């Protein structure tokens, strides 16, 4: 576990057990980072994936991500009920658009939270906020629109809401999931996986998938970051966000 977080994570170590060496197999090291929110920590935990076996995907259909990396395939685990876009700027320059399909039939409350924060229908939300934490070969994390550094954010239901379902899994690049501080502590922070992350299953609520612009996700993933807190050295901004027509 990363020493810089060791003091902060005493209370949450029981949530994600450390992976140890198995006889005859390489050691797999975990290091968990987090961000503080109302005396708790919202995080997407870090774990090397070099020795992880691929998670089995439960899919309803398969699509090739438009504008994604060559040969990249996205597995959609549920019906897309709405589409959200993020127009991304890196270092003040346009980097392109990410389009996310949301699984409203599977996790309606979680999707409604994300969709409302994306459209700004309540007067606050993701537009103008930043991806505050990036870990290569793992995930990019954002959604803190109050502080911009991982210490804030709020849901449309109040500061926190419950884990709706763990039926959907972290099957690969493009999976959208909620960051949390343990059971039933969802707010506004989210992360997008850049690799399969099966150790997050049954701990974080999956509620969508990148269906266009995975190359933009990869641009974000490739940014140089601080060794202290994995924050990108160039600002990675959601310059504009909103909802798209489902058939558009």
From Swiss-Prot:
Q: What class of enzyme is it?
A: isomerase
State the activity regulation: Binds cyclosporin A (CsA). CsA mediates some of its effects via an inhibitory action on PPIase.
Q: State one Pfam family annotation.
A: Pro_isomerase
- Per the record, the domain of life is Eukaryota
GO MF annotations in UniProt: cyclosporin A binding; peptidyl-prolyl cis-trans isomerase activity
| Reactions it catalyzes | [protein]-peptidylproline (omega=180) = [protein]-peptidylproline (omega=0)
Major subcellular site: plastid
* Tissues showing expression: Highly expressed in leaf.
Question: Taking every annotated instance into account, which residue ranges of this chain make up the domain PPIase cyclophilin-type?
Answer: 85-243
Q: Where is this region: Disordered?
A: 223-248
Q: Name one GO biological process term.
A: protein folding
Q: Where in the cell is it found?
A: Plastid, Chloroplast stroma
Q: Which UniProt keywords apply?
A: Chloroplast, Isomerase, Plastid, Rotamase, Transit peptide
Q: Which InterPro entries does this entry report, sorted A to Z?
A: Cyclophilin-like_dom_sf, Cyclophilin-type_PPIase_CS, Cyclophilin-type_PPIase_dom
Q: Does the keyword Oxidoreductase apply?
A: no
A GO term from the CC aspect:
chloroplast stroma
Keyword Isomerase included in the entry's annotation: yes
Stored CDD domains = cyclophilin_ABH_like
Enzyme Commission number(s)? 5.2.1.8
- Family from the record: Belongs to the cyclophilin-type PPIase family.
Biological function: PPIases accelerate the folding of proteins. It catalyzes the cis-trans isomerization of proline imidic peptide bonds in oligopeptides.
Protein's name in the database: Peptidyl-prolyl cis-trans isomerase, chloroplastic
Q: Which organism is it from?
A: Vicia faba (Broad bean)
């Amino acid at each position: 576990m990363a020493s810089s977080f060791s003091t902060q994570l005493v209370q949450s170590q029981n949530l994600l057990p450390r992976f140890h060496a198995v006889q005859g197999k390489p050691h797999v090291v975990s290091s968990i980072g987090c961000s503080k929110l109302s005396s708790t920590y919202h995080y997407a935990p870090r774990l090397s994936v070099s020795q992880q076996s691929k998670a089995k995907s439960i899919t309803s259909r398969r699509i090739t991500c438009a504008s994604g990396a060559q040969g990249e395939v996205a597995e959609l685990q549920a019906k897309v009920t709405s589409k959200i876009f993020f127009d991304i700027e890196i270092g003040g320059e346009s980097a392109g658009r990410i389009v996310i399909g949301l699984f409203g039939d599977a996790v309606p409350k979680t999707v409604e939270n994300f969709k409302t924060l994306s459209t700004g229908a309540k007067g606050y939300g993701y537009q103008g906020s930043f991806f505050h934490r990036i870990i290569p070969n793992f995930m990019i994390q954002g959604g803190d629109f109050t502080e911009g550094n991982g210490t804030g954010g709020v849901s449309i239901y109040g500061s926190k809401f419950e884990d709706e379902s763990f039926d959907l899994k972290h099957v690969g690049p493009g999976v959208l999931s909620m960051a949390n501080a343990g059971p039933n502590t969802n707010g506004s922070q989210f992360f997008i996986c850049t690799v399969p992350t099966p150790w997050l299953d049954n701990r974080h609520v999956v509620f969508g998938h990148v269906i266009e612009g995975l190359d933009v996700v990869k641009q974000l993933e490739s940014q140089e970051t601080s060794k202290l807190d994995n924050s990108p050295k160039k600002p990675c901004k959601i310059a504009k966000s909103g909802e798209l027509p489902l058939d558009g």
